[in-house]
Swiss-Prot record:
InterPro entries: Peptidase_A8. Enzyme activity is inhibited by globomycin, a cyclic peptide antibiotic. Optimum temperature is 37-45 degrees Celsius. This is Lipoprotein signal peptidase. This protein specifically catalyzes the removal of signal peptides from prolipoproteins. It comes from Escherichia coli (strain K12).
Length: 164
């Protein structure tokens, strides 16, 4: 018996689209208005700074000759498919997990688009304290981290099934 998509976690796929629109829109604005390396202060400890990342988080494998582009693209596709299957197998009422999965998929697809279209990921958020700067990142990275944090949080919450 087939189930309605609205009764599964796939009901939350709209959030993937929202993450993609916001992420790709922010990257488009950076590409149209900034030269590589340009910085604009927003608030104390927060700048907009156009950087290119040819690797993964913290520029991991950025200087590896180009193969990493396809490696990380494959990881993004694989994770997105696995999480979409998990969403399909979960109930729409399992909000925290489905929101987390949608955020991760949206972020992964946003960075995947950059890797395939530009050959690098557009980063623009520069958080700093004094002279110390955290690695420059983007909104897709933020969505992935928030999604991962929600999965960890869900692991600490009491299960409703155990209460019944």
């Amino acid at each position: 018996m087939s189930q309605s998509i609205c009764s599964t976690g796939l009901r939350w796929l709209w959030l993937v689209v929202v993450v993609l629109i916001i992420d790709l829109g922010s990257k488009y604005l950076i590409l149209q208005n900034f030269a590589l390396g340009d910085t604009v202060p927003l608030f104390p400890s927060l700048n907009l700074h156009y950087a290119r990342n040819y690797g993964a988080a913290f520029s991991f494998l950025a200087d590896s000759g180009g193969w990493q582009r396809w490696f990380f693209a494959g990881i993004a596709i694989g994770i997105s498919v696995i999480l979409a299957v998990m969403m399909y197998r979960s109930k729409a009422t399992q909000k925290l997990n489905n929101i987390a999965y949608a955020l991760i998929i949206g972020g992964a697809l946003g960075n995947l688009f950059d890797r395939l279209w530009h050959g690098f990921v557009v980063d623009m958020i520069d958080f700093y304290v004094g002279d110390w700067h955290f690695a420059t990142f983007n909104l897709a990275d933020t969505a992935i981290c928030v999604g991962a944090a929600l999965i960890v949080l869900e692991g600490f919450l009491p299960s409703r099934a155990k209460k019944q």
